[in-house]
Swiss-Prot record:
It comes from Acinetobacter baumannii. Belongs to the class-III pyridoxal-phosphate-dependent aminotransferase family. GO terms for molecular function: diaminobutyrate-2-oxoglutarate transaminase activity; pyridoxal phosphate binding. The modification N6-(pyridoxal phosphate)lysine is found at residue 289. Homotetramer. InterPro entries: Aminotrans_3, Aminotrans_3_PPA_site, Dat, PyrdxlP-dep_Trfase, PyrdxlP-dep_Trfase_major, PyrdxlP-dep_Trfase_small. Its cofactor is pyridoxal 5'-phosphate. This is Diaminobutyrate--2-oxoglutarate aminotransferase. It comes from the Bacteria. Pathway: Amine and polyamine biosynthesis; 1,3-diaminopropane biosynthesis; 1,3-diaminopropane from L-aspartate 4-semialdehyde: step 1/2. Its EC number is 2.6.1.76. Pfam families: Aminotran_3 (PF00202). PANTHER family: DIAMINOBUTYRATE--2-OXOGLUTARATE AMINOTRANSFERASE. The keyword Transferase applies.
Length: 445
């Protein structure tokens, strides 16, 4: 049976395929429970289900599809690679295509190939995160890691240990030891109850003092790992001066600074990498999702000083995905040629509703219950019931998006970078309508 011969069954419905999926796949499946559709085809910012209904896609493979679905240049790259005679899988053997992709990607890192080298990892962001921590421990000879509340770094054993959300962690015993969590700045829900500049200043001082205090009780870590914009944690943007202090302190104490750019990277924030908003240079950059142009690929950018690997010190069978390197090269070229970083910045600043935060096309809207008293910094309690109802109402209005953040109360928009002004207007119109419908359903108002 070929791919082209797999057509929807006669008169098949979404329910038909979802029922079959529930019968054949593990209970672990997640997205179909919130977005109950079976996708037949997709193009750009739109997907069409097996019943012929079209949806605006503001999920985009959790940010993987920077150029949207089935971009002509991406499809052409796949066809060209298949026709070229290149092997699809090369371990870490080199090819002309890999050489071109490596050079193009290095050019986007601060200082380029003079400052950084690349390491190709397994196919997922979690694989690259695991490799980054292993490298930091190899380089420093130390064993502990500092991560941050609200952070997300993957679902594997080690990466889950460094992730803030407890729902997945509570079911697993014996995660990687030696992870120390620290508070991450959050203007709307400041962990110190201060908010504003006072909260940022206090957290900046706290981090520096924690590292330098000989009575802190925590030995010097091998690495500090963080996201410049927390995605799954609710689209929380790190303040510039806090990030700059993290860089200053880690550099002073020879602690490896790892920036997880798996979701925020590749122009989504309005710059190629989200850490660029603070003007810093990480020691290790974790890249996946958009780096492969929609196909599985994960890469580390490593400052040459920290490239402590011995030959074959870290390997992985699927680190030589030629199709992904080809499509990744197309994404890099298209981002530059069409100035998609600027497009992300402009579309992200389009007037919107609610409590919006983030950068570029990485946007979060936190849903609260304004009827209940605000806390000491003026933030109302989260309303998870209403947030879930809004997501459902968005789906019913043919708009696909995800929730995240604490208690699942942040509506997240990860639109493809190619989204047009007209499509942004349509997203907002559908979202407004969904919010109004959800309010009636939940509160009768």
């Amino acid at each position: 049976m070929s791919v082209t011969s797999v057509n929807p069954a006669t008169n098949a419905t979404n329910e038909y395929y979802l029922t079959r999926q529930s019968q054949m796949e593990s209970n672990v499946r997640s997205y179909p429970r919130k977005l109950p559709l079976a996708i037949a085809k997709a193009q750009g910012c739109w997907v069409t289900d097996v019943e012929g209904t079209q949806y605006l896609d503001c999920l985009a493979g959790a940010g993987t599809l920077a150029l949207g679905h089935n971009h002509p240049a991406v499809i052409q790259s796949i066809q060209d690679t298949l026709a070229s005679g290149l092997p699809l899988h090369t371990l870490d053997l080199t090819t002309p295509l890999k050489d071109a992709f490596t050079e193009a990607l290095l050019a986007y890192l601060p200082g380029g190939k003079e400052e950084y080298c690349l390491q190709f990892c397994g196919p997922s962001g979690a694989d690259a995160t695991e490799a980054a921590i292993k490298l930091a421990k190899t380089y420093t000879g130390r064993s502990s890691v500092i991560s941050f509340s609200g952070g997300y770094h993957g679902m594997t054993h080690g990466s889950l240990a460094m992730t803030g959300n407890l729902s997945a962690k509570n079911a697993v015993n014996g995660l990687m030891p030696g992870v120390q969590f620290m508070p991450y700045p959050h203007e709307y829900r400041c962990p110190l109850g201060l908010g504003g500049e006072a909260g940022v200043d206090a957290l900046t001082y706290y981090f520096e003092n924690f590292i330098e205090d000989v009575e802190s009780g925590v030995t010097k870590p091998a690495a500090v790992i963080l996201e410049a914009i927390q995605g799954e944690g609710g689209v929380v943007t790190a303040p510039v001066k806090w990030l700059q202090k993290i860089r200053e302190v880690t550099e002073k104490h020879n602690i490896v600074l790892i920036l997880d750019e798996v979701q925020a990277g590749f122009a989504r924030s309005g710059k190629m990498f989200a850490f660029e908003h603070a003007g810093i240079e990480p020691d290790v950059v974790v890249m996946s999702k958009a780096v492969g142009g929609g196909l599985p690929l994960a890469v580390l950018g490593i400052k040459r000083k920290f490239d402590a690997w011995q030959p074959a010190g870290h390997t992985g069978t699927f680190r030589g995905n030629q199709l992904a390197m080809g499509t990744g090269l197309v994404v890099l070229e298209t981002i530059k040629e069409q100035n998609l970083a600027q497009n992300a910045q402009e579309r992200g600043e389009f007037p919107c509703i609610g409590n919006v935060r983030g950068r570029g096309l990485m946007i979060g809207v936190e849903i609260v219950d304004e009827r209940k008293p605000a806390d000491r910094i003026g933030s109302h309690p989260a309303d998870s019931q209403l947030a879930a109802a809004i997501q459902t109402a968005c789906f019913n209005n043919n708009l696909l998006l995800e929730k995240g953040g604490r208690n699942g109360t942040v509506i997240r928009l990860l639109c493809p970078l190619i989204i047009t002004q007209e499509e942004c207007v349509e997203v907002i119109a559908r979202f407004k309508k969904a919010v109004a419908e959800a309010l009636v359903a939940v509160r009768g108002a």
